[in-house]
């Protein structure tokens, strides 16, 4: 039996980040539903991002399910390697 559930996706971002725009676009092209948390508008959320990402301060910070993907470069690399669809539950 195939698992058809899709993992929860969270992207921590800011309103001025071009890499956030690229990550958002890639996830949207994949048809992924995700939550976007703007850390420039909420310091408590920024602190949560820092804790969850192991102290990484750059944005975006992307999580697919329990997996910390990292930023846009890592997300793009997963897509090019054919792994992103699998992580999104689409493979």
What are these regions (language model features)?
Residues 2-13, 51, 81-82, 88-91:
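C-terminal alpha-helical interaction module
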Residues 38-57, 83-91:
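Thioredoxin-like thiol-disulfide oxidoreductase module
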Residues 2-33:
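Local sequence-structure signature of Cys/Sec-based thiol-disulfide redox active-site neighborhoods
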Residues 22-24, 30-31, 51, 77, ...:
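Non-catalytic interaction surface on structured domains
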Residues 54-63, 73:
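Structural micro-motif
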Residues 64-90:
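Non-catalytic, surface beta->alpha helical segment in thiol-disulfide oxidoreductase systems
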């Amino acid at each position: 039996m195939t698992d058809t559930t899709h993992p929860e996706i969270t992207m921590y971002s800011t309103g001025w980040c071009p890499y956030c725009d690229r990550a958002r676009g890639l996830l949207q092209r994949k048809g992924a539903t995700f939550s976007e948390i703007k850390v420039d508008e909420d310091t408590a959320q920024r602190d949560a991002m820092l804790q969850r990402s192991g102290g990484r301060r750059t944005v975006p910070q992307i999580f697919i399910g329990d997996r910390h993907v990292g930023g846009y470069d890592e997300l793009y690399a997963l897509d090019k390697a054919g792994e992103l669809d699998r992580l999104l539950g689409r493979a």
